[in-house]
C-alpha cells in the first residue's frame, strides 16, 4: 500500500495499521526533510482515492509569512458540512503555521466529526499544537528511514557527491531528493554545513560574528539543524571527549530550535547559542 514511500519499518507498520482502521483525526510529526506532506497525501489517496483536499500555509493578501488562516478553515467547513456516503480526506500540512484563533476553529471541526471525513494533520513542530487537538488525534511520530533504504535515491550519482548528499541529508528522503535534483539547494546546504563546522571550531567572538549573518528565520533554523547533525556526528566519531558536554550542547541546540520555531527573536536566540555553546 505504501510501497512508493521510503519509510522506517516501524513507521510503515504504524501507518499500515492506521489505514486498516483509520482514526477521524491523525497528527503526523517528524523532523524536517522526511517528507510528511507526501506521506500524508499518500495516506489520503489510499483512504479516499481522488477525494483528497490538500491545505498548506500560503501567503494571504499582503502577508509576508505563509499561514493557514480563518478563510482556509471556513472553506474546509463548507466542504464537509453535508453528509456523504463516500470517504473524503482533508490533509492540513504544517498545521502549526496558523493565524491567531485558527486552532480554535480546527478544534471545532475535530470535535464535531462528520461520518466518512478524515483529517490528516502534519507538523515539524508538535509543541506548537494545542493539547486539545493532540488529545483528539491519533499521533504518529514518523521515524527517519535507515541509511540503506535511503540509498535507493542515490543510484547513478558519482561516489563523491553521494557521500556529500548522504551526510547533508542525514537520512531524510525529501531533503535527499531536493539536494540531488536542485544544484542551488545543494550548494546552500553545503555552505550551511561549512558554517556549522566553523561555528564548532571557532571561539565565542567568531561565533558571534558568524550568527550575526543570519537574518532569515528559515535559514537560521536550517543552520541549527546542520549544527545538531554535525555535533552528533563528531561525538560518534570520538572527537568530543565528554558526554556531558555533548548533551549540554544538544539540549541548547534543541531549545534554540524550539524557540525559533515558535517565533522567538532570531537575533536574540542565535546570540544565546553563540555564547552558551562550548
Write out the residue ranges for each language-model feature.
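Conserved catalytic/switch belt of AAA+ P-loop NTPases
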Residues: 97, 101-121, 131
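Charged, glycine-rich active-site and insertion segments that engage polyanionic ligands
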Residues: 1-34, 39-51, 55-58, 116, ...
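Conserved alpha-helical scaffold flanking the Walker A/P-loop in AAA+ ATPase domains
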Residues: 13-18, 67-90, 97, 101-108
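Flexible beta-alpha connector loops of hexameric P-loop NTPases
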Residues: 62-69, 95, 139
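Short catalytic-loop micro-motif centered on adjacent basic/acidic residues
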Residues: 91-92, 141
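Short glycine-centered, acidic/aromatic-flanked micro-motifs in structured strand/loop junctions
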Residues: 30, 92-94
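Walker B beta-strand of ABC/ABC-like P-loop ATPase nucleotide-binding domains
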Residues: 90-91, 121
Amino acid at each position: 500500500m505504501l510501497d512508493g514511500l521510503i519509510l522506517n519499518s516501524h513507521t510503515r507498520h504504524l501507518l499500515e495499521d492506521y489505514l486498516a482502521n483509520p482514526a477521524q483525526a491523525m497528527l503526523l510529526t517528524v523532523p524536517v526533510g522526511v517528507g510528511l506532506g507526501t506521506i500524508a497525501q499518500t495516506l489520503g489517496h489510499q483512504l479516499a482515492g481522488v477525494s483528497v483536499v490538500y491545505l498548506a500555509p500560503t501567503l494571504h493578501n499582503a502577508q509576508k509569512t505563509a499561514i493557514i488562516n480563518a478563510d482556509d478553515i471556513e472553506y474546509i467547513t463548507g466542504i464537509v458540512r453535508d453528509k456523504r456516503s463516500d470517504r473524503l480526506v482533508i490533509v492540513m500540512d504544517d498545521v502549526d503555521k496558523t493565524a491567531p484563533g485558527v486552532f480554535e476553529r480546527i478544534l471545532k471541526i475535530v470535535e464535531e466529526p462528520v461520518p466518512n471525513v478524515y483529517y490528516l494533520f502534519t507538523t515539524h513542530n508538535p509543541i506548537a499544537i494545542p493539547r486539545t487537538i493532540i488529545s483528539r488525534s491519533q499521533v504518529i511520530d514518523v521515524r527517519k528511514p535507515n541509511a540503506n533504504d535511503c540509498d535507493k535515491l542515490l543510484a547513478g550519482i558519482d561516489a563523491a557527491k553521494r557521500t556529500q548528499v548522504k551526510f547533508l541529508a542525514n537520512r531524510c528522503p525529501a531533503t535527499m531528493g531536493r539536494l540531488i535534483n536542485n544544484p542551488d539547494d545543494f550548494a546552500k546546504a553545503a555552505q550551511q554545513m561549512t558554517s556549522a563546522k566553523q561555528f564548532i571550531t571557532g571561539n565565542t567572538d567568531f561565533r558571534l560574528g558568524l550568527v550575526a549573518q543570519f537574518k532569515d528565520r528559515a535559514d537560521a533554523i536550517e543552520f541549527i539543524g546542520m549544527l545538531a547533525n554535525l555535533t552528533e556526528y563528531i561525538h560518534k566519531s570520538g572527537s568530543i571527549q565528554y558526554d556531558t558536554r555533548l548533551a549540554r550542547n544538544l539540549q541548547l541546540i534543541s531549545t534554540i530550535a524550539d524557540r525559533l520555531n515558535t517565533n522567538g527573536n532570531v537575533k536574540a536566540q542565535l546570540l544565546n547559542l553563540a555564547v552558551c555553546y562550548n
